[in-house]
Amino acid sequence: MGIKSIIIDQKQVEAGCNAALKWCNEHFAGKQVIVLGILKGCIPFLGKLISQFTFDLQLDFVAVASYHGGSRQQEAPKIVLDMSHDPKGKDILLIEDIVDSGRSIKLVLDLLHTRKAKSVILVSFIEKLKPREADIKVDYSCFKNQDEFLVGFGLDYQGFYRNLPYVGVFDPEDN
């Protein structure tokens, strides 16, 4: 299957999601928030959180494309599905599966800034620790990783493996 090792098992996934949930509920207590998921990878993470958020929210999505079948970004990211709610004057909770180079997130952050969002908080399931191409701040991450190619729990290779209930190190040469 190409998975060399499991680095975040199902119990760790649950614990990470629960910790993120607690952090978000404390941070956004008493606020009305637009929860903005970045498709497609956010689905498992956001799915674990959404029904247990204790603050008032509107749910929205944005999709950014920059990978085309490979394991590395191949072109400048672009918005391929825009959000439907107006972020002007609103608090935004941005949910992402992984922050890697930062280029895709920077595009979304710039869009929200241009549209005059009141505040933007970025919560990522995994944050890569390698130097980023874009200068962005992750406000909360469940897990940190150096620079391994990961699949599972929303992370994919050519559209596959997002459904795995764990996160594994992937070797595309062994697929």
UniProtKB/Swiss-Prot annotation:
The residues the record assigns to binding Mg(2+) are: 96-97
Where is it predominantly found? cytoplasm
Q: Which residues form the active site?
A: 100
Output a single Gene Ontology CC term carried by this record: cytosol
The pathway it acts in is: Purine metabolism; IMP biosynthesis via salvage pathway; IMP from hypoxanthine: step 1/1; Purine metabolism; GMP biosynthesis via salvage pathway; GMP from guanine: step 1/1
Where do the annotations place diphosphate binding?
A: 40-41, 162
Q: Which UniProt keywords apply?
A: Cytoplasm, Glycosyltransferase, Magnesium, Metal-binding, Nucleotide-binding, Purine salvage, Transferase
- What are the BP-aspect GO terms? GMP salvage; guanine salvage; hypoxanthine metabolic process; IMP salvage; purine ribonucleoside salvage
* Known role: Purine salvage pathway enzyme that catalyzes the transfer of the ribosyl-5-phosphate group from 5-phospho-alpha-D-ribose 1-diphosphate (PRPP) to the N9 position of the 6-oxopurines hypoxanthine and guanine to form the corresponding ribonucleotides IMP (inosine 5'-monophosphate) and GMP (guanosine 5'-monophosphate), with the release of PPi.
Q: What is this protein called?
A: Hypoxanthine-guanine phosphoribosyltransferase
Q: Which gene encodes it?
A: hpt
